[in-house]
Amino acid sequence: YTLPHRIRDGYGLSEKLIRDAYEQGCDTILTCDNGIAAAAEIDLAKQLGMTVIVTDHHEVPLHWEGDTSTAVLPAADAVVDPKRTDCAYPCKGICGAVVAWKVLWLVQRICGQPDAWKKYLAFAAFATIGDVMELRGENRTITALGLQQLRQTDNVGLQALTAASGIEPDQIRAYHIGYVIGPCINATGRLDTAKRALELLTETDTMRAQQIAQELVSL
């Protein structure tokens, strides 16, 4: 995987990221929370013979001619975005991480793992709150169920960050994600790259996770 560096890469797909992936032997690009407006970059990837799957939740760019507008989708092999004008998905206000989670959910179901989505429910709730989505409809359900899971998570990184923030696990509320824990996760991405936060969430060693959590809290 690659996490864009805020200074070197900007936000989302860039020509540099695509060429780097190609030179490393990657034949497929799967985006999360970006790509819907990266038509030129995706054209480059297709010219290089790569498969591109976009998962995003941002508005689809429009091309205007007079008073008439036409949605402009990138030439990806698949574009999953609830904001597509031809998408009948009822909850248009899900965040980008939830869009990716739902794609993963479908893939796991096809692979005979219909309940595997539950493993990532806490992260879906975390992302929904952290991205300041409106907590109505499906978002409210995801958040309510995800908070229950988060309070008893076995994710070493989340446990460490909760402890470093001085929060009792069984007391975690949406407020804590939005104003205490969430900003710690976002901080590294705002400064340069979100790599440090991802390292925390994928860490399995308790002491190492505690060290990273303390670093994030101190930012």
Give, region by region, the residue ranges found by the protein language model.
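Amphipathic alpha-helical transducer elements in NTP-driven molecular machines
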Residues: 39, 94-97, 101, 140-144, ...
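Short, glycine/acidic-enriched loop or turn micro-motifs at the edges of active sites
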Residues: 36, 59-60, 84, 134, ...
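Short alpha-helices
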Residues: 68-113, 117-129
